[in-house]
UniProtKB/Swiss-Prot annotation:
SUPFAM superfamilies: P-loop containing nucleoside triphosphate hydrolases, WW domain. Residues 861-885, 893-902, 911-920, 932-944 have a biased composition (Gly residues). PANTHER family: ATP-DEPENDENT RNA HELICASE DBP3 (PTHR47958). InterPro entries: DEAD/DEAH_box_helicase_dom, Helicase_ATP-bd, Helicase_C-like, P-loop_NTPase, RNA-helicase_DEAD-box_CS, RNA_helicase_DEAD_Q_motif, WW_dom, WW_dom_sf. Disulfide bonds: none annotated. A motif (Q motif) lies at residues 435-463. It comes from Arabidopsis thaliana. GO terms for cellular component: nucleus; plant-type vacuole. It comes from the Eukaryota. ATP binds at A479, K480, T481, G482, S483, G484, K485, T486. Keywords: Acetylation, ATP-binding, Helicase, Hydrolase, Nonsense-mediated mRNA decay, Nucleotide-binding, Nucleus, Ribosome biogenesis, RNA-binding, rRNA processing. A motif (DEAD box) lies at residues 588-591. Its main location: nucleus. This is DEAD-box ATP-dependent RNA helicase 40.
Amino acid sequence: MATTEDTPASAGPRYAPEDPTLPQPWKGLIDGSTGILYYWNPETNVTQYERPSAPPPHSATTPKLAQIPVPSSGQGHQAQHEQAKPVGHVSQQHGFQQQPQQFPSQHVRPQMMQQHPAQQMPQQSGQQFPQQQSQSMVPHPHGHPSVQTYQPTTQQQQQGMQNQHSQMPQQLSHQYAHSQQHYMGFRPHMQTQGLQNSHQTPQGGPHGQQFPSQQEYNSLAPKREGDEFHGGKKTGFSQPHLPNSERSPSQNTHFEANAASQKTNANLAMAQKCNGPQANAAVTQFQQPGANLIHQQLGPRAPNQMDQTMLHQKSHVSPFQSNNTYENNLQSRPGNDSYVNMRMEVPVRGAQPLHPAAMPKDIRISGGPPTNADPAMGQTGHGTYGHAGPAFPNKSLVRPHFVTSPDVPHLSPVEIYRKQHEVTTTGENIPAPYITFESSGLPPEILRELLSAGFPSPTPIQAQTWPIALQSRDIVAIAKTGSGKTLGYLIPAFILLRHCRNDSRNGPTVLILAPTRELATQIQDEALRFGRSSRISCTCLYGGAPKGPQLKELERGADIVVATPGRLNDILEMKMIDFQQVSLLVLDEADRMLDMGFEPQIRKIVNEIPPRRQTLMYTATWPKEVRKIASDLLVNPVQVNIGRVDELAANKAITQYVEVVPQMEKERRLEQILRSQERGSKVIIFCSTKRLCDHLARSVGRHFGAVVIHGDKTQGERDWVLNQFRSGKSCVLIATDVAARGLDIKDIRVVINYDFPTGVEDYVHRIGRTGRAGATGVAFTFFTEQDWKYAPDLIKVLEGANQQVPPQVRDIAMRGGGGGGPGYSQDRRGMVNRFDSGGGGTRWDSGGGFGGRGGGFSGREGGFGGREGGFGGREGGFGGRGGRFGMRDDSFGRGGNRGRGFTGPDAGHMNVGGRGGFGRFGNNNNMESRGFGRGSGRGFGRGVGRFDNRRGRSRSRSPDLVRPRRRSSSYSRSRSRSGSYSRSRSRSRSWSRSRSRSPRHSRDRGGHNRSRSYSRSPSPVYERRDRAPRVSGFDIKPPVESVVNLDMNAAAAIENVVPTSLSERQGNGVVESEVEAALVRPVVDEEP
């Protein structure tokens, strides 16, 4: 007992200092949690708070259990043999184990659950048997003291025989009680067990002693057990309501827990959870011949699983260790949450510090249901639910074991992870993903860098590609923007460099190709950031910067080279780089590089790399071009897809707003959005052209401090702009698609598509600049009816990302744009003619302004047919897509040979006819033109016409308007002051365009007939022409008389002649001077 008193204070009861005045066999106990002193009789297992005055009287009557029917007489013989055991031994096994259930400390359930039966049994046996006082204090795994007893072999054998007999169904109460006591001796840590058995344990011994607590039970036992027996649930003494699969090895018969016993225990666990008392009865072998099959499987050894002798015979495993194993196993198994909850409930419900005799029976067993439900209770009493508790339906107490539906396949954690993150793989022997950084086995220094960067776990693309890449296998990874692809290949590169140990001065070991300078420098920054601890060197090669510094860095040596294909190919041709050490090749944004036309350079570079390399290809889309180059460059690759590959998907973390905005309202709406953002929020505005970027920078930048980046900026300017934007000094970045891919800047809140891009893929990449690395973002897109052909794909992207689709966009998609989509005429490549509108109308007549759809002169974005203003120019040019007054190459319109009809930067004439169609343009100045479609060849072009914006004068703003064209000076079509057409002899495009764009502008000059003049020169234009036109065999010269006195009918006739004339002029450059003179004279007469 001294050993027990020296035990540290814990939540469980402990012996009080020995008091010689206490009558025997009473002992003083102290509740470890409350410190309350109470008294316990080991023989009767009675506890009370009043100090006992005399030993309690012993009942001389034996329990009358003859009324309990027994299934066989053979078991009774074994029970009679068990009667010969000393009663002291029975008490020794059950004395102190039963007492904790009556203490106030019994309400502290965790200590009871964690305390092994072997801890408490010696405490009682130490009082009664001197040979068992050799106890060893063993620190319990859960922090509670545990007592390990080493018993003599004789007593172990005796206990073993008792256990063997206690397995069999009992006829007599003392046998029943002995079996119960002995079994409970190994489950003292189960509190509810104690609550029940404290009243039933001293039911009787070999001498037929019966104590008051047993008398309480006898009044109920015959009726209850009889009822249960007739139901096939004979439970005269019951195994604990515990699935055997949840027991520790110490509770098994041979302690080894072999496969057969595990299977049997699993069946028993299922039966106990689903069948309740029937399963318990089966375990106790108290069955009729037709009882549970589980009893037949377990045989007579089931109760012996708790045999103390068998437990201690396995000296290499201590009892407390076995109990710890069980507890851990119990808590770790599924389906035990209901038991845990019940274990938490029991102490609370039994926490009243009442005298055991004064406590109601239902309170003493803690209400009944948890007693039976708790699998850790050990033996729960004679009845399944406790001797003093009402009968409960078992399903209300124990949660049935979870059984998956046969329809649903069992998924492993890896499959669940892949399904949750939409990870699909194609290949053989694909390893499981690294769900956490710790499971990846990465070097500590790399893990520190990743954790310090704030990454909680690998992204799906990283988790799946890392283990594959570390196997030196080729990979094709397809994932959307912002998915963490950069670290997906950098981390394997770091691991490779740790093993290779190559001399970087002989050439790089890792080569990474990227499409743009911005992405290349960004990859370099990430490599230096996460490879700092690994002492990795990295250099970046890109165009737009001097080669000298880059070559010097290569000479110093670099483990990793990040390059754009163009600059790397240049350096390779200079033979300033050696690829013989390259072991890892990475193609980042491979689809973008192919779109930019880098495939020849890529193939040339790859041919210089040894074939033993490992190749990783990361792409956002999977078109056939990418598939082809992947099949050529990769060997047996593993394909890893994040999301669906067959459709373009946007990041669902981005809220997308698509607004149908007229061109003239875009700038005003842009300013509204910028003003609505929080101060300091980073915004990217994407435009389709450099010119528009500069224009917006001038108009918007004054108020919002915007910076611009596009292809015309030098590398120094680009770096400065990006640094300004990253640092927050400039919160608005205006960019072309050069920044649509690979640009990774934190805290970008808003992306605005001022122009819709040339494809939905670019749209997805544009908006992907926000919502990166798990953040959220907002994207605004200005959509016009001219973008109608992208509407169906845009709707798919919006619906795929669960975004709202505006009704206007649906209408545009249904009608094909422009108010009658099928009416759009197309050019030779199937593209929509820019100046044709559907439904037979013309683009020049279709909208506000001077016929323009969005104001201006029917340009896509205002101006005179221009996309962004100007006279037909896409951005502020006179018909030019890129130049100010013309096409990309500063020409007017998109005429026959791609728009060099009326070239020159400052011309007063322009191609108002546009790409084609019979477009009309008119204002009340002097314009009337009719385009005759695209025409054929240079002479006729894509819409002919000329615009003279001056009232009554044929003066061109530039005297050398058409000097780049025809150099022949045989005649002058017009005596304009500028002489702009004096050198055009061929009449190819100059004349044809002039014919196409003039039919209206003479109406404002006194209501005369329509004049087809191109100029309103104050002097007669053709009177000085004495030279007759050259006559050829195929020229048809129109009669001069029909056009001299021109009226409306004659004008119509002339229009019918013009196509033939034009086609002829295209062939030989004939000039119909008479027709031109007739066209000019009515205008000349009007001059003052």
